[in-house]
């Protein structure tokens, strides 16, 4: 059974992306930079097919004819370049792989994310995140440059962004020695992301405010990486009042570790206001259309259960999962989150009825078993029925399998419906 029905296929053909970025930093600083960067990406990609080889051979032997008839050159090169042009999804995927590399560096040099890695690793985290942001912005420009925008591009782009929340949380956890709090840094990136996706489903436009995560948020993070490469990761472990003397007068905050203080400040001044605006905007749309707000809120249910289930599992766990296995917890939950976001985006692209999508709950399938296994430890002198490492490994493997099945299936269905390829700009033969 596929993910896209007949109505969805029809909708894909007429879907148009709508998004607005009100960030002044993006408008006056980064957009000009990104516009220059896109010119570094070629409009061509070598292929090894016989047709390509013959075209290059023809191009070489007909150089004289092209010089005599320049209009022939324009037509030939125009058609040929479009045939070999790499689809922007390749740029998106490359940017995402930068963050996977960053997370792997963190795992190698700080396996439990509670010890300082070499300072060059902090610098590498910052550089790789900067490259991710650049590639993530340039892919859309490349799509417009090559006239290859498609619903698949939006799903691919935002799908990679959803997974990026997990891998960058691990990279930042390495830099700031967050330890078990690394999961919470993933949460404060995942919550606004999910609510923004949910909002765009109802408003049909992705609106980024004057200060937003993809621009100022990422900039703040990679600047933090660069700062740590100079100051050392120990800066994040000392009391906030010592790290920031100007706020040493603030009670409570000045006595807790800097990384935890930053976490609380982000929740108070970034996450809560953003989510409030998202819910308020959806409420306006629902009210104007005389729809049901509880039905709209039901689409948040799987995400809330995912977070609640993982937190309950960790609370009951005798193994302290988030401390001993932070990478497995974040990657497993991050991929389950990626499935939820991808399913929500697909519902938007295909104009599905608003409300809970039951197959979104597939991402929650392992949690009841994991929680039950943790409970058995309370009946067996602290020893669970199954070693929690293997349960966590199974949870992560299931999340990986679920996401890969969803991603490959949907890519196949969309490319078949639209007659395109995922990583190459050329029409499929009928």
Describe the role of every protein-language-model region:
Residues 35, 39, 43, 62, ...:
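Short helix-loop boundary/capping segments at the starts of domains
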Residues 1-44, 48-49, 56-85, 189-430:
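C-terminal membrane-associated helical module and adjoining short loops/tails
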Residues 46, 87, 91, 136, ...:
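Structural signal for hydrophobic/aromatic residues that build the beta-strand cores
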Residues 108-109, 174, 349:
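Helix-loop junctions at the membrane-solvent interface of multi-pass transporters
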Residues 54-55, 75, 79, 92-154, ...:
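Membrane-embedded alpha-helical segments that form the functional core of polytopic membrane enzymes
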Residues 58, 96-99, 161, 225:
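Residue-level recognition of pore/gate-forming positions within transmembrane alpha-helices
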Residues 142-217, 221-222:
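Histidine/cysteine- and/or acidic
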């Amino acid at each position: 059974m596929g993910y896209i029905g007949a109505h969805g296929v029809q909708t894909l053909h007429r879907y148009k992306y709508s998004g607005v970025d009100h960030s002044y930093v993006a408008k006056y600083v980064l957009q000009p930079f990104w516009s220059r960067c896109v010119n570094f990406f070629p409009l061509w990609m070598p292929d090894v097919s016989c047709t390509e080889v013959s075209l290059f051979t023809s191009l070489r032997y007909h150089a004289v004819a092209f010089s005599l008839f320049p209009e022939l050159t324009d037509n030939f090169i125009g058609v040929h370049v479009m045939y070999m042009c790499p689809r922007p999804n390749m740029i998106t995927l490359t940017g995402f792989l930068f963050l996977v590399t960053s997370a792997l560096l963190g795992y190698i040099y700080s396996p439990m994310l509670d010890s300082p890695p070499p300072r060059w690793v902090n610098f590498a985290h910052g550089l790789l995140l900067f490259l991710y942001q650049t590639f993530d912005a340039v892919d859309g420009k490349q799509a417009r440059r090559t006239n290859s925008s498609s619903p698949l591009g939006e799903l691919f782009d935002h799908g990679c962004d959803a997974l990026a929340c997990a891998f960058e949380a691990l990279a930042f956890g390495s830099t700031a020695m967050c330890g078990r709090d690394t999961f919470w840094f993933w949460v404060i990136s995942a919550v606004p992301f999910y609510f923004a996706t949910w909002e765009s489903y109802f408003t049909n436009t992705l609106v980024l405010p004057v200060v937003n995560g993809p621009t100022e948020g990422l900039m703040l993070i990679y600047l933090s990486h660069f700062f740590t490469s100079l100051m050392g990761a120990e800066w994040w472990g000392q009391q906030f009042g010592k790290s920031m003397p100007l706020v040493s007068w603030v009670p409570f905050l000045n006595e807790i570790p800097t990384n935890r203080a930053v976490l609380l400040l982000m929740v108070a001044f970034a996450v809560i206001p953003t989510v409030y605006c998202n819910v308020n905007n959806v409420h306006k749309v629902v009210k104007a259309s005389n729809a049901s707000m509880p039905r709209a809120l039901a689409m948040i249910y799987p995400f809330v259960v995912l977070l609640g289930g993982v937190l309950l599992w960790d609370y009951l766990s005798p193994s302290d999962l988030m401390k001993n296995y932070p990478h497995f917890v974040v990657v497993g939950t991050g991929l389950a989150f990626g499935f939820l976001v991808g399913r929500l985006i697909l519902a938007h692209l295909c104009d599905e009825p608003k409300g809970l999508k039951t197959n979104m709950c597939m991402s929650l399938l392992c949690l009841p078993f994991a929680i039950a296994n943790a409970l058995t430890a309370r009946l067996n002198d602290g020893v669970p029925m199954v070693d929690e490492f293997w349960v966590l490994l199974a949870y992560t493997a299931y999340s990986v399998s679920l996401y890969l099945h969803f991603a490959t299936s949907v890519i196949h269905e969309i490319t078949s419906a639209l007659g395109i390829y995922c990583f190459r700009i050329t029409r499929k033969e009928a």
